[in-house]
Curated annotation (Swiss-Prot):
May have a role in sperm development and fertilization. The gene is Insl6. The lineage of its organism: Eukaryota, Metazoa, Chordata, Craniata, Vertebrata. It comes from Mus musculus. This is Insulin-like peptide INSL6. Disulfide bonds join C33-C172, C45-C185, C171-C176. It holds the Pfam family Insulin. Keywords: Cleavage on pair of basic residues, Disulfide bond, Hormone, Secreted, Signal. The keyword Metal-binding does not apply.
């Protein structure tokens, strides 16, 4: 009976040994340079299966061009009520085709106002009548750089020398763990 328990524990220990080595590999820094570092970061950041998400509503092309779709339809730059017509048909419809090939008469802009819903969500339009448009644009830039500074301080800590040394240099010279390489994915995460 004792031998059976001991042999079971021995086999259990032998089976768990490879799994304990995997945890050591994740916490151990690895020196990666150049394309090897890039491949590891891409593997780490792109582990989730993006094909199961419906990306059409979030695509920037569908915000600007409602006729564009990723579901196999081709993009049609010539819809009937579009500003594209101004550049693709420079001659008014009443002019003959022969005369149209020898003259270039640009049409006027169509009378249509852009709605705020068609603009990018973070885009802001400032006029000079509002007082200080430069100050407002600087404030918007500060918000985006504050996020980057937060990411940087998570990775580098408060050491100025470490901040000066780049991410690739640190991983190449000293080495990076998987947790440190995961910080490279943070700028691509939408908060």
């Amino acid at each position: 009976m004792k031998q059976l328990c001991c042999s079971c524990l021995l086999w259990l220990g032998l089976l768990l040994t490879p799994f304990s080595r995997e945890e050591e590999e994740e916490s151990r820094p690895r020196k990666l340079c150049g394309r090897h570092l890039l491949i590891e970061v891409i593997k780490l950041c792109g582990q989730s299966d993006w094909s199961r998400f419906e990306m059409e509503e979030q695509s920037p092309m569908t915000q600007f061009f409602p006729h564009y779709s990723r579901k196999g339809k081709a993009f049609n730059p010539h819809p009937s009520s579009s500003a594209w017509r101004r550049f693709t048909n420079p001659v008014p419809a009443g002019v003959s085709q022969k005369k149209g090939t020898h003259t270039w008469e640009p049409q006027s802009l169509p009378d249509y106002q852009f709605e705020k819903t068609e603009l990018l969500p973070k885009a802001r339009v400032f006029s000079y009548h509002s007082g200080k448009p430069y100050v407002k644009s600087v404030q918007l830039q500060k918000k985006s750089t504050n996020k980057m500074n937060t990411f940087r301080s998570l990775f580098w800590g408060n050491h100025s020398q470490r901040k000066r040394r780049g991410f690739a240099d640190k991983c190449c010279v000293i080495g990076c763990t998987k947790e440190e390489m995961a910080v490279a994915c943070l700028p691509f995460v939408d908060f």
